[in-house]
């Protein structure tokens, strides 16, 4: 695989990337995403952790980008990475797929503001890292996982039901479970992850427990003109729902039979409706 550098001189982060003295490899599409996600932390007292030091080029890039107030921490498997401590970085050696490593690390460094996973890119490494990061990132912080295109590589054990990308999709499902209409108890991650952003080869999680609350419908109590809602006018499914609701409070055998029959009919109608639009899924990829 050939790696090509594309320099966009309008990107401050790219200019920094090109100016640092030590090697770093980043895909050219990452810079605009990083600037959009991370600009708010520039010149702030933030703790930034990067998994995967390599030749430390990115550590120098982050220091210059975030500014002198930032605390930059690097994690790597290679003990030789400790040499970068003399440049003012905090370096920890360990396996990102190890539960005990993360437990011990966060006991030592405390909560962080930004964690960037540029480590080994396996499903296990990305998922274990995300699990512990989500619990230990401050409200208002970010978890960013790079190079998730490996989730589509056979040599990385994919495609897999348990890929990191599918893990991220499940978190999205959990976020949507906060909707009042679903009336579900949402999972652990949904109480910490406010939103998930997908970029090419990158996934970003916005961590903020303050915003992770169950949503409820509201009204501005403005004047109503009694406008008819045409969304469901004439829809067979809507008529069936209304008919089913008439039996909602009844626990009789006949009511249960009617509700079960309506559910079966609704499932059939839903499958028939799917045929009309599933062709558009072909354009997704």
Specify the residue positions occupied by each region the protein language model found.
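A short alpha-helical cap/connector motif
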Residues: 1-114, 120-144, 149-285
